Structures are given as structure tokens and as C-alpha cells.
């Protein structure tokens, strides 16, 4: 018989494995992505001080409600977090894809942040 693969557990294992290598500092904080079915969330985190510096999501008031779970919405969220980060003086980050495959919404979010001026 075939075993059913638990995708959430696989993602969590992948995320923990990557988190051993990816670490955010005050000079180069970590850009962390969380993707739900309907929305996408992103934070810029300083792991040394355990502080979230900047956060944005598709639930923010500046985004339309019908654009949360698609690639266009993810690109807008990436641009928004980059704009907020640049206002705080952050230009370089380490990208933490959260165990997700670098494809689709995660890729669009990264491209939106890059186009808005963040360096990975």
C-alpha cells in the first residue's frame, strides 16, 4: 500500500532544516514568508535580538480583498514590505522561503521585493 504524504509535516521539516543555515542579523535580517490558502504574510526579522522589524500581509488595508491568495497579490505584498524596510534603513536581507518551494506566490513575493529595492 501507498502511504499518504503529510505535506504540512514535510514543509515543517524542510523549514527547520533550512532554518539551521539561514540566520538574520541586525545588518542583514531574515525575510520570512508564510503562505496560507487565501493569504500571504511576510516579516523581516532580526534573529539576534529576536525582534520583528517590519511586517506586511495581504490582509493589510492597503490591499484589495480579492487579491490575497494569488500571484499578483503576493507581488504587491513583496513590494510593500520592501518599501517599509527601506524606510527603516534595511536594504539587504536573507530570504527564508519557510519550507515552501520557490515557485508561484513565494517567487512572485521575492521578485516584488527585489523590484522595490531589496537585495537578497
UniProtKB/Swiss-Prot annotation:
GO terms for cellular component: cytosolic large ribosomal subunit. GO terms for biological process: translation. One of its GO terms (molecular function) is 5S rRNA binding. InterPro entries: Ribosomal_uL18_bac-type, Ribosomal_uL18_bac/euk. Pfam families: Ribosomal_L18p. Keywords: Ribonucleoprotein, Ribosomal protein, RNA-binding, rRNA-binding. Belongs to the universal ribosomal protein uL18 family. PANTHER family: 39S RIBOSOMAL PROTEIN L18, MITOCHONDRIAL, LARGE RIBOSOMAL SUBUNIT PROTEIN UL18M. This is one of the proteins that bind and probably mediate the attachment of the 5S RNA into the large ribosomal subunit, where it forms part of the central protuberance. Part of the 50S ribosomal subunit; part of the 5S rRNA/L5/L18/L25 subcomplex. Contacts the 5S and 23S rRNAs. This is Large ribosomal subunit protein uL18. It comes from Clostridium botulinum (strain Eklund 17B / Type B).
Amino acid at each position: 500500500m501507498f502511504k499518504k504524504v503529510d505535506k504540512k509535516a514535510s514543509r515543517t521539516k524542510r523549514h527547520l532544516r533550512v532554518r539551521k543555515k539561514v540566520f538574520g542579523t541586525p545588518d542583514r535580517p531574515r525575510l520570512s514568508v508564510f503562505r496560507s490558502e487565501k493569504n500571504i504574510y511576510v516579516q523581516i526579522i532580526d534573529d539576534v535580538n529576536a525582534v520583528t522589524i517590519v511586517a506586511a500581509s495581504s490582509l493589510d488595508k492597503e490591499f484589495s480583498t480579492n487579491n490575497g491568495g494569488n500571484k499578483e497579490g503576493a507581488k504587491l505584498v513583496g513590494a510593500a514590505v520592501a518599501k517599509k524596510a527601506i524606510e527603516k534603513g534595511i536594504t539587504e536581507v536573507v530570504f527564508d522561503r519557510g519550507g515552501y518551494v520557490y515557485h508561484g506566490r513565494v517567487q512572485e513575493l521575492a521578485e516584488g521585493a527585489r523590484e522595490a529595492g531589496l537585495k537578497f
